Amino acid sequence: RNDRAAYVAAGKDGLHFEAPRQWTFDDGTDLGSYNTQAHWVTHEEGLFLVYTRRGAGNDNVVRHRAPLFMAQVDPARLVVLRATEIELVPNKGAQLGNFAVVDVSERETWVTTSEGMSPGNPAKFGSNGRVYAARIIWEKPNRMWDRH
């Protein structure tokens, strides 16, 4: 767990990696993610990251674990492309930090999560323990969808 930043590293064989570097947007600014999960969404035409971050009007959520964002990653530079960032699951006051990604078909990927009703009364912001399945519908089929 890191209370300051999130990091990324690349390697060719899955065993040996370059030195970790802090996740940033393509303009060089800090991604703002820390202390929680991030997951890859893969498509044959792009690599995407699902994450939480600070700086999204979300100081009301423990460790800024809502909303869930998704953005495309430049795999050569290991940066998140800011212009591609979208909000997948909204901030309703509860934590969304424990989530999963699953390829359902060549045309659809889901990001699933639930509202973690931790202390601090997240219900006052609209949370009620919802379960989410954010559906990503691809314009072009992802022929890699079942090759994990």
Question: Which role fits each region the language model picked out?
Answer:
Residues 1-32, 44-46, 52-92, 106, ...:
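Beta-rich carbohydrate-recognition and catalytic domains
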Residues 36-39, 95-102:
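Beta-propeller and closely related beta-sheet repeat lectin domains
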Residues 99-112:
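Acidic, serine/threonine- and proline-rich intrinsically disordered appendage/tail regions
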